[in-house]
Amino acid sequence: MNGIKQLHAHCLRTGVDETKDLLQRLLLIPNLVYARKLFDHHQNSCTFLYNKLIQAYYVHHQPHESIVLYNLLSFDGLRPSHHTFNFIFAASASFSSARPLRLLHSQFFRSGFESDSFCCTTLITAYAKLGALCCARRVFDEMSKRDVPVWNAMITGYQRRGDMKAAMELFDSMPRKNVTSWTTVISGFSQNGNYSEALKMFLCMEKDKSVKPNHITVVSVLPACANLGELEIGRRLEGYARENGFFDNIYVCNATIEMYSKCGMIDVAKRLFEELGNQRNLCSWNSMIGSLATHGKHDEALTLFAQMLREGEKPDAVTFVGLLLACVHGGMVVKGQELFKSMEEVHKISPKLEHYGCMIDLLGRVGKLQEAYDLIKTMPMKPDAVVWGTLLGACSFHGNVEIAEIASEALFKLEPTNPGNCVIMSNIYAANEKWDGVLRMRKLMKKETMTKAAGYSYFVEVGVDVHKFTVEDKSHPRSYEIYQVLEEIFRRMKLEKSRFDSLLQPEQLCI
């Protein structure tokens, strides 16, 4: 910085104009305050200098200053270039409304740059980020020539809004696809929870010899493998990532750890976590702590948290979800309460709904139902169905009718068409021989339109076929064979005298 100031002083003394060089050096540091003062005192501003500063303000999250400079450019009698519009469109995407962008769009249209593919791509992206997909699509449709980035920008817009049907219609219409095109739709399906389609698209991508998956593709596919239990494909992706040097990318490493954890390979996940060494980030720690908690290794999760603090990594809200989950699975009430209390007092983290949910679960499992209910009453946010459902489940286990009635009443308001709450409450009444309550639940179910959503599981078969099995469904082409196998399994279970917990009630009281 001292060198720049000395050069600036030399220019002022000698009258040599080195503003362009000085400005670019200042923006590299960056020192926007000094750069703006230099710019404002410069007598012969040009579009190039305006563009550099407009871009700098956008990059450093000051989009309003970019707009101010864009307006000054016109007052100075200068014409914006295609670079100007590209930078100002990108800056406008940070606003809460699409109105400024529409005004800029109209000026862009009159400027003669409307056929510039690069600017149109940025304009489509900006409209999409602001949720103005109709405007983005209009720009796309009015273009006479569309290159691959333009197609990708429009597909990404639909993907971000969760409209995968529109995204796939465009994707299928593309004359030529690149790795970004494939990765965008794969990521879209994965982020929207449609893991089977994400995996199917990846397997189709592998057949396209003109494209090669990149590290973003790998990061997008691994969650699908994790949630579908596709360990073999996950292993193949790990090998591919290592061969292509993608394991230098922390996001690839974290996604791989998550995949192995969810596929039950916790020891492999731990080994990969140790391999990361100093490369580990907060996401790595959170993923490993959460995985250990999920697999019942609560002591290891807490030990890892202590190591995390020793190494100077600051926890966040996600960290404490994993820690409290470990306490829930380990039945460690006191430790859970200590951690919950430390969130605000030590780490300055405000507990969220999921943290309260963990605490309700923790207290409920050990029978501290009144304490759990008291905690719900102190929550700064409105308890959701998960919180009340957790309390109701605990009441069912411990046979507490009084608090169960409070929880069920809240659930009936939040989920009036969910029959599960009525069934649980009916079972609680029956276990305590309160048959009038059972009849009341039965009448409520008949009065209200309650339908239970069918449960299902995904199983990935050979090739790209993913089969969805629904409870009592017979639409599968091999359903006869499937049910034959199930009957044989049930027969063998009975022979082994497997015991099922079921509550038998008088026929007139059954739901």
From Swiss-Prot:
One of its GO terms (molecular function) is RNA binding. Coiled coil: none annotated. PPR repeats lie at residues 46-80, 81-115, 116-146, 147-181, 182-213, 214-248, 249-279, 281-315, 316-346, 352-382. GO terms for biological process: RNA modification. It comes from the Eukaryota. It holds the Pfam family PPR. PANTHER family: PENTATRICOPEPTIDE REPEAT-CONTAINING PROTEIN. Belongs to the PPR family. PCMP-E subfamily. This is Pentatricopeptide repeat-containing protein At5g08510. It comes from Arabidopsis thaliana.
